[in-house]
Amino acid sequence: LISGTFVPIFIGFLKSQEPYHSLILSESELVYCHKYGAWSMPHSNFHHSGIPKVEDGFDYLELNAVGVKVNDIDDFLSSIAPRIAGKLLIEQRNLFMQVVQKHCKNGNCPSEWLIEDTHYTSHKGISYTGLIAMFANRMRHLRQLTGYDLLLPASVLDRSIWDFSHSLNAWRNNPVVFIESQLESKTPENRP
């Protein structure tokens, strides 16, 4: 009976030690692993990355995130599960609202920016419903407001947003060379 009590506690402890976020770059794809699921993007679907900026009077405010522009949204949406789409909608809402606030200084925000619709039809005519449609609408609004489809918050990265964006673009330009350079920098003789 006592050992039956310790096993669930031990399993709970092990689960709590799992990483909450992880990004994996291979020669063929970018994978975002989250405690609640994962999404992947083939190299061919990655357009570019950068730091999203929003106009703030005469200046620009950089979001504390890396923006990713996708080549084919339908290809991306087919790879994401509703569970992680819903979690990302919630977790990234504060970043999205920072963008919306800068575009709605007079208080006249379009209602679709504040609440994502549960229906979405892509440019290819593919219809989505539920959480995937809500996520697709968020992607559409992000692209309209920042030029990027996805956000990778600084909290999920292992380096600064500028370094990570540079790394993603280097990976886009030549994934084989980028992966080799990362492996070489991790070898013992190349460490400081």
Residue spans of the language-model regions?
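N-terminal membrane-targeting/pre-transmembrane regions
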Residues: L1, K69-N71, P153, L157
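Hydrophobic alpha-helical transmembrane segments
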Residues: L1-S3, S127
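Conserved beta-hairpin
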Residues: P8-V54
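A general structural signal for short secondary-structure junctions and capping/turn motifs
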Residues: S22, G57-Y60, H141-L142
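Ordered hydrophobic segments in well-structured contexts
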Residues: S22-L25, L63-G67, D149-S155
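Generic secondary-structure microfeatures
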Residues: H34, G50-K53, V70-D74, V100, ...
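Short, surface-exposed polybasic-and-hydrophobic patches located at secondary-structure transitions
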Residues: D59-A81
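Terminal and domain-flanking low-complexity segments
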Residues: P82-P192
